[in-house]
Amino acid sequence: MARSTLARLRGRLRPPSKGDAEMDYWSRRAAVEGALGNAHYERVFTTQFGLQRSFFDAKRVLDVGCGPRGSLEWATAAARRVGLDPLVERYRELGIDRHAMDYVAAPAERMPFADASFDVVASLNSLDHVDDVDAAVVEITRVAAPGATWLLTVEVGHEPTATEPHSLPWELAEDLAGWRLQWSARNGLRDDHDIYASIDENRPYGGAGPGLLRARLKRATS
């Protein structure tokens, strides 16, 4: 068999990259929705963590693994609104340039920010998507200012997938170096796997199988 034919066959058999799988998901969502909406994000950042909108006033806010919806457009009184995602350049075809926030193309494991750059860091349905969870946590800790808040929502206990390669434990937020756990909650998942709707409904966790962990943590000041 010709070498070029073998190369073509290997290309067809190679599984899609994590980035390709993520883009396929978002492209399908855009096709269904017409335009990717973001009206739900205010309650995701506030109500789902027991916070008021004013908590974010004058703060530098970073959303790690932000996706292409414009997750921080609602935070109009924030001092800075930054979404970090390795797929930012590919998201431009989905219309992110119209959003009233900044986007930075970089992985969570290598953030191009100075130490102590942010007062609020969010990782909402993203920590199990990264390549290296430990490295991502180190970077989140580094870019968070003393006294900063980390808002964490993550699915735990699921089987690894192409886009979510890590199965994380419920105890994830209990002993993170440099952070103090202020509040946490557990929820079950709806059959349609809608994470934020599951939280809105305060769906109880049944004690077995995958579930949702929310945590609000405070960065140590010394």
What are these regions (language model features)?
Residues 62, 66-110:
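Class I SAM-dependent methyltransferase SAM/SAH-binding core
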Residues 192-222:
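Core SAM-dependent methyltransferase catalytic element
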Residues 134-149:
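A short glycine-rich, Lys/Arg-flanked "PGG" loop and its adjoining helix->strand segment in the class I
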Residues 106-121:
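A short acidic, Gly/Pro-enriched loop at the edge of an enzyme's catalytic core
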Residues 1-34:
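N-terminal, positively charged/glycine-rich alpha-helical extensions of SAM-dependent methyltransferases
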Residues 151-179:
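Conserved class I S-adenosyl-L-methionine
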Residues 120-131:
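A short SAM/SAH-binding and catalytic strip from SAM-dependent methyltransferases
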Residues 38-59:
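Conserved alpha-helix/loop element of class I SAM-dependent methyltransferases that forms part
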